[in-house]
């Protein structure tokens, strides 16, 4: 009889109650599709997965010899044939417990996930369990010895996208947890004044840890905003502006940023690792141009006019870097951090978006240039000028400085705008789903951090007998409710945007 996955004996299962037994089942449960007569009870085995019992055909399981149950069927057959000899393999190597008398084998796994595994044994097709995250489903099928490449084509694309997103966020979470553990356990456990450095670090890096930290965070945000506004006013030539006052304000803001960076630098022990972090690099780039500008201006006093012009250009370039101060708000904004995570994760989608735009710009700019070049006073003087027009048209900005005048040119412009709308809509939906997932993941993490800090503070107060009467259960319940609320918002957001495939 052919035992191929499409033509093998039909596998039947039954979930029994606690009082059920193998002999109480009707013999039709064990009927094979090819022969039309019941299989012998000795050809079946009972597996108990998470409290649910399933009666399976050993003959059908043997069609999958590389899976856990396929190996179990072979081991059970060998065990029956050889008995309890030393050479016979034991079924306990493949299951958590066994009852050889009733031919029942126990597995402490999810019975809901096992139903998908059972369907695979029946049909040879593995479908993804939507109620389980991708990584948990992968752990389940790996336990049963099924490769993820066996997932059917209808679920494969959705599964691998969810798995990639889960792995990325888990890696980010593990990295952040390791960094947090490194800072709390290594940076302050050694060196002078560990308690002072720990408290100072909490004020600088954890705005919600105390009242002083919240005040410091607000002041830091104010200085960033004042610095940006001051930079904009210094570039404006207005008669009522006091440039000397603006310069003094610039010195004050730079002094604050410098002191903040030095305090962070002095608090940590691994300073090389501190300087490699992106937020600290941004802080350094925000203050270095100011000091380099002062140094260049002080050294350019005895140079010629040409050299002074070159120095002036260098100073202007360095002053442009002051705009990076806006990125300092990322320390206090979950949205900005989520944007950074999204760009990091969606580099393929962003590259695809740029590729689509580049192809469209190249095609439509060339067509538009040749359609408009016969007009005497045309604004399409060259293909690069047409590039600018195609860019503003495909992104639906439309400055109007360059526009077509001929009928053919207007038809091409309509097609350019329409293609831009369609092309931009494709990857942006994916990027939006990733941003929503990253944002709510960070919010959940912040809620967990606040819960951990509150529990640590209560534990410390209890240890010193200086605590106020607080119900620890209520604190824990409030934190859990906050995380559940955020998780519910995440589900609602992903479903409303059509992003069920990215919910994990």
Swiss-Prot record:
Residues covered by region (Disordered): 1-22, 172-193
Chain positions of motif Selectivity filter: 396-401
Ranges in the topological domain labelled Cytoplasmic: 1-214, 264-280, 336-349, 432-504
Localisation per UniProt entry: Cell membrane
An annotated Gene Ontology molecular function: voltage-gated potassium channel activity
Superkingdom, natural source: Eukaryota
Membrane topology: Multi-pass membrane protein
Similarity-based family: Belongs to the potassium channel family. V (TC 1.A.1.2) subfamily. Kv8.1/KCNV1 sub-subfamily.
Protein name: Potassium voltage-gated channel subfamily V member 1
């Amino acid at each position: 009889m052919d035992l191929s996955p499409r033509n093998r004996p039909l596998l039947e299962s039954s979930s029994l109650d606690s009082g059920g037994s193998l002999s109480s089942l009707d013999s039709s449960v064990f009927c094979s599709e090819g022969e039309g007569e019941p299989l012998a009870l000795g050809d079946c085995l009972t597996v108990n997965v998470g409290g649910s019992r399933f009666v399976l055909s050993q003959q059908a399981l043997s069609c999958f010899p590389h899976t856990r149950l396929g190996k179990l069927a072979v081991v059970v057959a060998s065990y029956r044939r050889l008995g309890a000899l030393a050479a016979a393999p034991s079924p306990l190597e493949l299951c958590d417990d066994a009852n050889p008398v009733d031919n029942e084998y126990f597995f402490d796994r999810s019975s809901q996930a096992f139903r998908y595994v059972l369907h695979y044994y029946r049909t040879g097709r593995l479908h993804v369990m939507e109620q389980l995250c991708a990584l948990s489903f992968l752990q389940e099928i790996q336990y049963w010895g099924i490769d993820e490449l066996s997932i059917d084509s209808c679920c494969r694309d959705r599964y691998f996208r969810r798995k990639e997103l889960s792995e990325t966020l888990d890696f980010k979470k593990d990295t952040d947890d390791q960094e947090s553990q490194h800072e709390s356990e290594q940076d302050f456990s050694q060196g002078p004044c560990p308690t002072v450095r720990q408290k100072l670090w909490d004020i600088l890096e954890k705005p919600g840890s105390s009242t002083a930290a919240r005040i410091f965070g607000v002041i830091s945000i104010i200085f960033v905003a004042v610095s940006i506004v001051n930079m904009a006013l210094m570039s404006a030539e207005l008669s009522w502006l006091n440039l000397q006052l603006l310069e003094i304000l610039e010195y004050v803001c730079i002094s604050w940023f410098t002191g903040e960076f030095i305090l962070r630098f002095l608090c940590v022990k691994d300073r090389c690792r501190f300087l490699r972090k992106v937020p600290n690099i941004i802080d350094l780039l925000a203050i270095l141009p100011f000091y380099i500008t002062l140094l260049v201006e002080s050294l350019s006093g005895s140079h010629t006019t040409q050299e002074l012009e070159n120095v002036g250009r260098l100073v202007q370039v360095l002053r442009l870097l002051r705009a990076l101060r806006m990125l300092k708000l990322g320390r206090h904004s979950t949205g900005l951090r989520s944007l950074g995570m999204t760009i990091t994760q969606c580099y393929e989608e962003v590259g695809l978006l740029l590729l689509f735009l580049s192809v469209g710009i190249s095609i439509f700019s060339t067509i538009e240039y040749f359609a408009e070049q016969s007009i005497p006073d045309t604004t399409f003087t060259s293909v690069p000028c047409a590039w600018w027009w195609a860019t503003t048209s495909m992104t639906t900005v439309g400055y109007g400085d360059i526009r077509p005048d001929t009928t053919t040119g207007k038809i091409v412009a309509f097609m350019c705008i329409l293609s831009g709308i369609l092309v931009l809509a494709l990857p942006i939906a994916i990027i939006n789903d990733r941003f929503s997932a990253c944002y709510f993941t960070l919010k959940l993490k912040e809620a967990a951090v606040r819960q951990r800090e509150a529990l640590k503070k209560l534990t410390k107060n209890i240890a010193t007998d200086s605590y106020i009467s607080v119900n620890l259960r209520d604190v824990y319940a409030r934190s859990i409710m906050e995380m559940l609320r955020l998780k519910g918002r995440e589900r609602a957001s992903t479903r409303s945007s059509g992003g069920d495939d990215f919910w994990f």
